Amino acid sequence: MGSQSLRAGFLVALGFAMGCDKLALPEHVSPMAPASNPGVGGHLDSGMTFVPSTPSPTDSDGGAGDAGIGSAACAFLTNLDAPFSKSALLTSVAQCTQQQLCQFDPLAVELETKLAAYAAAPSPESLTGARDAWYHALQQWQILEMFGFGPQAPKGDPGGEGLRDEIYAFPAVNRCSMEEQLYDQTYAGSTFDMAPAGARGLGAVEYMLFYTNTDNGCTALNRLNGKQLWSMLSAEELANRKVAYAGALGHDIRAKSALLLSAWSASGGNFAQTLASAGPGGAVYMSEQAALNAVSNGLFYLEQDVKQWKLGRPAGLVECTANCAGYAETRYARVASDNVRANLKAFRLLYQGCGPDYQGLGFDDWLHAVGADSVADEMSAALDAADAAIAQFDLNGAFEQNPGSVAPVYAAFKAISDVLKTDVITVLNLDAPMMLVGDND
């Protein structure tokens, strides 16, 4: 009886999070509504940023492309010193992508393990382990966000299998959709992997582990509120369901990571070879230029997702004029700055090179090869300035207390995207993504 009471008390302390959706939403689901209390979560005090208690198992000596876990198995980079050619650049990109995926997979395994342990025996200790594993997996995935081509891309894109959104759907993470799954207990069924992407993945794990309130984020017209279904669930029952949901998410993320790794591997879909061998008769890309165009589109994650949605919108600089802090990425764990720093590192890996200190072939080598040294130098300076701007900056605190202070960081990232979408794509004869058509920002 005593142990059950302690467990119940711990479970009641667990709660529900906030999300947003840019995809088609179910009727009466509120998209992208700012959180009412974005700083509260788990054992975190209001306003505190989550800091993991353990280092990432993939930590190494700090080299841009080095790995810790599985470093030998993930040693894909074989042509760091190759002279520039389009073919060599595509090979480097393929190897870099495989290396980053190879580093993510053991973190997905660790996340599955820690979430399973938490679901089996909820406690402050198992919660800490689950949170640490989530953070480390998320930070490696923030690197992979820039590699949004091939199997990661949406279905309908060349080689796209839609696997990116299956693992992390930001900014389409949807709190109300998660709460509908909680009420319906779809996480306990065999069709959970068919639930909306905004209710699964790393964004949903954050929701389960960090938010402590027992309210929901759906509109008054949603069935959970309109029919008073949500209020029929006790705080303890809601907490129990969240713990079970977290365990199911771990299995789902691990399965999707395995699919993605296989899609790129020689023993699976071998998309690495598909990318590296682009050209006439290619299975996906009929020319090297077409393949490089797809890769360059990945770089534009920094323009739309980072500059606009991770910096501009929660700061009230674009698309929002009031109560904008709730749009922040990972608003409950409050690690928005870490995410953006990882995104910037990812841009440099893809643009400059995937080796230690960004050695190896990248788009900057292509610029030098065609005599556009000034463009390469301008981008290098912009990257260094953005690194300095975000290095010690607390985005979550700024969004809530002083959103105007984000403007210099936003401007630093805008300088990168301005060079990218004007000089770089013009000189290299690349096409801008469709999302930029008509964009004058």
What does each model-found stretch correspond to?
Residues M1-M18:
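Sec-dependent bacterial lipoprotein signal peptides
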Residues C20-A72:
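Ser/Thr-rich, Pro/Gly/Ala-heavy low-complexity intrinsically disordered linkers and tails
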